Amino acid sequence: MKVTLIAILTCAAVLVLHTTAAEELEAESQLMEVGMPDTELAAVDEERLFECSVSCEIEKEGNKDCKKKKCKGGWKCKSNICVKV
């Protein structure tokens, strides 16, 4: 009974790890498309860095506060730099 339970839990853990690794590879393959040279990827990274580090310089309109730009599309803002999630 214990051996069966351990085997089932081990298989479940391997399946979860395999699925996570497959998702990461799929995301990387989408970024590294054949038609997209490294210079374009660098431009995307610079753009994301800019998006995250720009503070709000627009004056308030009425009662609305302006908002900082945020990182999007699988990136998060950390220490004013967009990093891949």
Swiss-Prot record:
Chief location bin: secreted
Keyword Membrane (UniProt): no
Disulfide bond sites: 52-66, 56-77, 71-82
Keyword list, A-Z: Disulfide bond, Neurotoxin, Postsynaptic neurotoxin, Secreted, Signal, Toxin
Source taxon at top rank: Eukaryota
Localisation per UniProt entry: Secreted
Pfam entry (one): Toxin_20
Propeptide: 23-48
Molecular function terms, GO-annotated: toxin activity
Tissues expressed in: Expressed by the venom gland.
PROSITE patterns: HWTX_2
Signal peptide: 1-22
Matches recorded under InterPro entries: Hwtx-2-like
Function: Postsynaptic neurotoxin.
Family: Belongs to the neurotoxin 12 (Hwtx-2) family. 02 (Hwtx-2) subfamily.
This protein's name: U4-theraphotoxin-Hhn1s
